[in-house]
């Protein structure tokens, strides 16, 4: 790996220039001066009169301190000092001629004085910002107050200051005077040149938040372990390899970020009450950790992205309270179902840019899951879809699951558990989300006693409580039954016995009747009705006594026959144990054969009903959310999910068939009252699935230009035979074992000298194209990487800047190199002509 560094880690980073509009056509020639200096004959810096397409030269930023400032945007670039309109070259008078505008040019000393004046601390302020000020030490002006210091006579205790933010400076140490800020709660010294934390910092008993990212720590600063009051600690982008044992003593710590360090494993000394843990961009290989098990009671957010994890250990099943799990850019091939199924609190699951080709069926049991990121994996069925398509419209989560049989089994189990709860509650109001992931709806009605056998869907005389789930679920009941019973739901337990005879094939529009224990029955319609359903209607009062007598006689007959058979079997068992065993085997084989035959018959019926249902569904769309006579009632089903809405429509079913569907933004329960019968339909909660991958643009043969995410998409890069990656930014290689990298550490600012790297980058690009292919990228794929691409085309094709620019923008229309880079490309054009 080749690594180039232009600025030291703690050097000042100038302000970010404004990003302009996309070029379309010839680049304006007046932007470039003949000598490449970026100035015109009028002595003013080059800029266009269109504010949306300027690249202004950064100026030193300023900031103010006031009591109403917050630390929510402390790392952002502050507003630069301006003097008039910097982008205006001249103004037109009434005659239409252009006059040069006068612009006062501040000297360096004047700028510094103005900055220092603007940074004067206002006595009594609770926050002080001093970002990008090139401070070499903490300014002493903040030590003002009513109580003078005995140790430092010229300074005073400042009891008002709560937040001190001095990011992106050149501070090398924390002074002892920091003790004069006894009520300081937030201290941020990110992007400085610190290498140690002094012990006296622990004297700040109110300090809760400490941010020391992007400094020069080669090991974890031990004195941090003595600051017991810390609740937030950030040490991103240092060279920390491990954590000390005493770190576990920070019992108040809830938010810890060790992003972009050199950790080889998940530390064992994590404090007990961590809620948010960021270990991304390290070198972690093993996902097993004792500390994760220990803190699982409090952990809600875990980031393990950009590591080298290949296997998710079974111990990760302890993450029962995690709501956000980030596993981007690892080497994961399989997600164990036993692990995934235990993440019941999960709301956001990020798995982009791994090697996953299948999701476990257990993912459908995660009721709180709302966002699933699957970009850049190996799901074959969606590779040919354009990335512009909406994933939430095209695909459902079930399509990413290969084990459909297990999927149906899990859905059935979940629905039966819900049905059992509804029976136990003996409620007439549906408040539970029924999983409706499969195709055909089934209606189950509770709170009734018996069921008549009919050839059509019965209409009850009283309002019933119908709950929709899918007909495919019933297949699993048949597959797992014996000759006499099958498992569903009862009032006392989770089992309901379905008698074998209900599954015998019926002809001539006869239905299969199933009698449930206690007061609930299920009827499976097997004729060619318009909609396959399982329904439990209320029986007529006139038939009640006769049906009860018939049931009693039938039960007595079964009981007598069973007793006789049991007595005979007991005698045979006592006489010949061997015969008993053989008989059991034969009996089980016969039962298995019958069940297999019944399973095939029912599967064939289900298949035909699904086809018919889909045809009917296309002709008559579902109930609209916003049509006539709606009455909405909010019912909470899950604590972390949006509440479903119940919409009651008292209207004829013929009218419902003609209504157009509307897009539903939340889970929905639709109750339709028609002829004194209530039908309830519950739609599954919406899930946002990201599957589209961002891919780079092909500029010329075997040369791709893109953003940083394109460099993350290793599956696409491997599929397109990319072997080399040129990174024109300060990003460490993501996959050094898969690709060869050249890192050019340079900022996207006008003053940066990218010209000096043209020769080295061109050689690397040539090598990559010879080996298979090369990707050139920066953060956005707009300025730095575009400049490198243009320079290579100028050299390789022996063309001028404008022609190389046109070739590049044709392949990637969003490119926009900054003004300084454009001037250097113009200079490169002159050098090539020599």
From Swiss-Prot:
Ranges in coiled-coil conformation: 555-615
Gene Ontology cellular component annotations, sorted alphabetically: cytoplasm
Catalytic reaction list: O-phospho-L-tyrosyl-[protein] + H2O = L-tyrosyl-[protein] + phosphate; O-phospho-L-seryl-[protein] + H2O = L-seryl-[protein] + phosphate; O-phospho-L-threonyl-[protein] + H2O = L-threonyl-[protein] + phosphate
Stretches forming LRR repeats: 160-181, 183-204, 206-226, 229-251, 252-273, 274-292, 298-319, 321-342, 345-366, 368-389
Comp. bias (Low complexity): 36-78
Gene3D superfamilies linked: Protein tyrosine phosphatase superfamily, Ribonuclease Inhibitor
SUPFAM superfamilies documented for this protein: (Phosphotyrosine protein) phosphatases II, L domain-like
Chain segments carrying region Disordered: 1-103, 503-584
Start and end residues of each Tyrosine-protein phosphatase domain: 695-834
One MF term in the entry's GO annotations: protein serine/threonine phosphatase activity
Chain intervals with Basic and acidic residues compositional bias: 538-554, 569-582
Biased composition (Polar residues): 79-98, 511-536
UniProt xrefs under InterPro entries: Dual-sp_phosphatase_cat-dom, Leu-rich_rpt, Leu-rich_rpt_typical-subtyp, LRR_dom_sf, Prot-tyrosine_phosphatase-like, Tyr_Pase_AS, Tyr_Pase_dom, TYR_PHOSPHATASE_DUAL_dom
Keyword entries, A-Z: Chemotaxis, Coiled coil, Hydrolase, Leucine-rich repeat, Protein phosphatase, Repeat
Enzyme Commission no: 3.1.3.16, 3.1.3.48
GO biological process: aggregation involved in sorocarp development; cell motility; chemotaxis to cAMP; negative regulation of ERK1 and ERK2 cascade; negative regulation of MAPK cascade; regulation of adenylate cyclase-activating G protein-coupled receptor signaling pathway; signal transduction
Catalytic residues identified in the record: 778 (phosphocysteine intermediate)
Knockout consequences: Cells result in higher prestimulus and persistent stimulation erkB phosphorylation upon cAMP stimulation, display strong defects in motility, and more rapid cAMP production. Cells fail to display aggregates, fruiting bodies, fail to form territorial streams and are defective in cell migration (absence of random and directional migration) and in chemotaxis.
EC class of the enzyme, as a word: hydrolase
Function recorded in the entry: Probable phosphatase with dual specificity toward Ser/Thr and Tyr-containing proteins. Dephosphorylates pNPP, in vitro. Essential for proper regulation of erkB (erk2) and optimal motility during development.
Family affiliation: Belongs to the protein-tyrosine phosphatase family. Non-receptor class dual specificity subfamily.
The protein's name: MAP kinase phosphatase with leucine-rich repeats protein 1
Organism in which the protein naturally occurs: Dictyostelium discoideum (Social amoeba)
Lineage: Eukaryota, Amoebozoa, Evosea, Eumycetozoa, Dictyostelia
């Amino acid at each position: 790996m080749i690594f180039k560094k232009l600025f030291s880690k703690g050097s000042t980073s100038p302000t970010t220039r404004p990003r302009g509009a996309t070029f379309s056509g010839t680049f304006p020639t007046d932007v470039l001066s003949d000598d490449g200096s970026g100035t015109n004959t009028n002595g003013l810096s080059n800029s266009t009169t269109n504010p949306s397409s300027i690249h202004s030269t950064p100026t030193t930023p300023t900031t103010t301190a006031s009591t109403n400032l917050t630390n929510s945007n402390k790392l952002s670039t502050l507003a630069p000092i301006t003097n008039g309109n910097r982008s205006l070259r001249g103004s037109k008078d009434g005659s239409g001629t252009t006059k040069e505008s006068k612009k006062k040019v501040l000297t360096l000393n004047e700028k510094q004085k103005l900055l220092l004046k603007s940074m004067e601390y206002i006595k009594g302020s609770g926050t002080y910002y001093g970002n990008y000020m090139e401070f070499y030490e903490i300014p002493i002006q903040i030590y003002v107050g009513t109580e003078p210091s005995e140790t430092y006579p010229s300074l005073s205790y400042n009891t008002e200051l709560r937040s001190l933010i001095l990011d992106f400076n050149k501070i090398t140490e924390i002074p002892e005077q920091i003790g004069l800020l006894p009520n300081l709660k937030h201290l941020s010294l990110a992007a400085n040149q610190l290498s140690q934390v002094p012990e006296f910092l622990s004297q700040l008993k109110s300090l809760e938040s400490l941010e020391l990212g992007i400094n020069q720590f080669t090991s974890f600063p031990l004195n941090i372990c003595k600051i017991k009051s810390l609740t937030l600690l950030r040490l991103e982008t240092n060279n920390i390899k491990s954590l000390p044992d005493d770190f576990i003593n920070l019992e108040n710590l809830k938010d810890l970020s060790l992003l972009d360090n050199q950790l080889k494993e998940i530390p064992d000394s994590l404090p007990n009450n961590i809620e948010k843990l960021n270990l991304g961009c390290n070198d972690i290989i093993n996902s097993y950790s004792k500390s994760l098990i220990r803190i699982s009671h409090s952990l809600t957010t875990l980031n393990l992205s950009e590591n080298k994890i290949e296997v998710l250990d079974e111990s990760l099943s302890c993450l029962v309270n995690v709501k956000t799990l980030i596993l981007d850019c690892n080497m994961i091939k399989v997600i164990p179902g036993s692990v995934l199924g235990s993440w019941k609190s999960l709301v956001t699951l990020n798995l982009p840019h791994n090697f996953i080709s299948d999701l476990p069926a257990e993912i459908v049991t995660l009721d709180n899951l709302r966002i699933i990121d699957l970009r850049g994996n190996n799901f074959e069925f969606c590779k040919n879809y354009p990335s512009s398509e909406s994933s939430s419209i095209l695909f459902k989560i079930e399509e990413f699951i290969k084990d459909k049989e297990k999927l149906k089994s899990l859905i059935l189990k979940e629905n039966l558990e819900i049905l059992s709860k509804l029976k136990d509650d003996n409620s007439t109001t549906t408040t539970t989300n029924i999983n409706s992931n499969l195709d055909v709806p089934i209606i189950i009605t509770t709170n009734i006693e018996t069921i008549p056998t009919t050839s059509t869907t019965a209409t009850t005389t009283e309002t019933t409580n119908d709950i929709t789930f899918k007909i495919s679920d019933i297949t699993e009941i048949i597959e797992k039954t014996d000759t006499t019973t099958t498992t569903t739901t009862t009032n006392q337990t989770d089992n309901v016995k379905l008698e074998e005879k209900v599954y015998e094939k019926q002809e001539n529009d006869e239905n299969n009747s199933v009698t449930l224990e206690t007061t609930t029955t299920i009827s499976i319609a097997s004729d060619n009705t318009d909609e396959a359903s399982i329904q439990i209607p209320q029986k007529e009062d006139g038939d009640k006594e006769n049906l009860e007598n018939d049931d009693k006689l039938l039960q007595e007959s079964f009981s007598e026959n069973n007793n006789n058979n049991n007595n005979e079997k007991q005698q045979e068992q006592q006489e010949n144990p061997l015969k008993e065993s053989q008989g059991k085997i034969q009996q089980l084989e016969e039962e298995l054969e019958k069940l297999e035959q019944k399973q095939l018959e029912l599967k064939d019926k289900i298949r035909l009903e699904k086809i018919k249902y889909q045809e009917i569904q296309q002709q008559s769309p579902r109930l609209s959310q916003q049509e006539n006579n709606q009455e909405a009632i909010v019912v909470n089903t899950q604590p972390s999910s949006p509440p479903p809405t119940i919409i009651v429509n008292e209207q004829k079913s013929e009218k419902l068939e003609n209504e157009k569907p509307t897009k539903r933004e939340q889970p929905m329960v639709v109750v339709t009252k028609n002829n004194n019968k209530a039908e309830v339909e519950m739609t599954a909660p919406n899930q946002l699935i990201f599957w589209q991958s961002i891919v780079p643009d092909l500029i010329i043969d075997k040369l791709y230009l893109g953003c940083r995410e394109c460099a993350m998409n290793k599956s696409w890069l491997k599929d397109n035979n990319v072997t080399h990656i040129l990174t024109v930014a300060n990003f460490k290689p993501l996959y050094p074992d898969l690709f060869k990298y050249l890192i050019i550490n340079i900022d996207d600012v006008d003053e940066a000298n990218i010209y000096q790297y043209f020769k080295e980058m061109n050689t690397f690009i040539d090598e990559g194209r010879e080996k298979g292919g090369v990707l050139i990228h920066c953060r956005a794929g707009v300025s730095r990487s575009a400049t490198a691409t243009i320079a290579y085309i100028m050299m390789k094709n022996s063309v001028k800047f404008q022609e190389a620019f046109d070739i590049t923008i044709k392949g990637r229309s969003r490119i926009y190199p900054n003004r300084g880079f454009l001037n250097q490309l113009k200079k490169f054009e002159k050098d090539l002509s020599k």
